Design a protein with these regions (language model features):
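Alpha-helical structural signal in soluble globular domains
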Residues: 33, 57, 61-66, 90, ...
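Residue-level signature of catalytic and energy-coupling elements of molecular machines
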Residues: 17, 159, 280
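Short secondary-structure transition/capping segments
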Residues: 50-53, 86, 111-114, 142-144, ...
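Catalytic alpha/beta core domains of metabolic enzymes, predominantly
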Residues: 123, 137-243
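Glycine-rich phosphate-binding "P-loop"
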Residues: 133, 155-156, 266-267
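C-terminal alpha-helical cap/extension of soluble enzyme domains
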Residues: 4-12, 29, 33-35, 44, ...
Length: 290
């Protein structure tokens, strides 16, 4: 069971190449700030625009630099089942604690296809698997029945839910059970998610505010929701501003502002507008980050 806030790590680039020095330093910054776990090469890590070799390298660097201080849930999803199996097995071989596998995007499988996809990955790997349900990006939305069926497969352990439907926390608990690991994939609704019984979150905001996010989550995990709400109030402007333009553009800008890495993105993502930069600056000041 994974609990706490896991950072959906940015992937630093420099002059078109992965910046390993900045990545290792950034991982240290996250761990030293109290973050509970790390998630390399998910959407926030620009997984669609890294090569296979870079994808695998990012996972290897993260596992090596974390050095078992915190768990690593490696992003290994693909809309090609065979590719997802390959990436999942690589993460397992290198020592990841689990794999985060997004629902297939663009080819839009139905519920039977979703079940077959995850079943094949699980049966061909030995690592715990988290389903990543994000219909806003993948178009498909895994329903409760399919998720319940998949949980019967021994190494499928839970979900990162980025649907913003808070009622699903209760539905999953009541139908699938308390042992189904539920992590929020939406920073702005994490407080409500936790009050409904969630176990933690995979966060974008924690890239730039790991201490605030980990303090917030520690309060949630101990049931101190009134105190957690005060920190959430500081973070809410950030939660909103970091998605004013396609992510991770705004959060990479903020990371550069803090001296953590370059804001360099890979096409088709482009530099954010001045208006968005101003909004992010304002939110960072409100959270006392700058």
């Amino acid at each position: 069971m994974f609990k706490g806030v896991f950072t959906a790590l940015l992937t630093p680039f420099k002059n078109g190449e992965m910046d390993e020095v900045s990545f290792r330093s950034f991982i240290d910054f996250q761990i030293e700030s109290g973050i509970h776990g790390l998630v390399p090469v998910g959407t926030t890590g620009e997984s669609p625009t890294v090569s296979h070799d870079e994808h695998k390298l990012a996972v290897e660097i993260c596992i090596d630099q974390a050095n078992k201080k915190v768990p690593v849930i490696a992003g290994t999803g693909s809309n090609n089942t065979a590719e997802a199996i390959e990436l999942t097995n690589h993460a397992s071989e290198k020592g990841a604690d689990a794999a985060l596998v997004v629902t297939p995007y663009y080819n839009k499988p139905n519920q039977e296809g979703l079940y077959a996809h995850y079943k094949a990955i699980a049966e061909n790997s030995d690592i715990p698997i988290m389903i990543y349900n994000i219909p806003g990006r993948s178009i498909v939305d895994m329903n409760l029945e399919t998720m319940n069926k998949l949980f019967q497969i021994k190494n499928i352990i839970g979900v990162k839910d980025a649907t913003s439907d808070i009622s699903r926390v209760f539905k999953y608990k009541s139908i699938i059970g308390d042992s189904f690991n539920q992590l929020s994939g939406e920073d702005a609704t994490t407080l409500a998610y936790m009050t409904y019984g969630g176990h933690g979150s995979i966060s974008v905001t924690s890239n730039i505010a790991p201490k605030l996010c980990s303090d917030f989550m520690n309060l949630c995990l101990t049931g101190k929701f009134d105190e957690a709400s005060k920190i959430n109030d500081k973070l809410m402007k950030l939660h909103e501003c970091l998605f004013l333009e396609p992510s991770p553009g705004p959060v990479k800008y903020a990371a550069e502002k803090l001296g953590l890495m370059s804001s360099e993105l890979r096409l088709p993502l482009v530099e954010i507008s001045k208006n968005t930069k101003d909004r992010v600056d304002e939110a960072m000041k409100f959270a006392l980050l700058i």
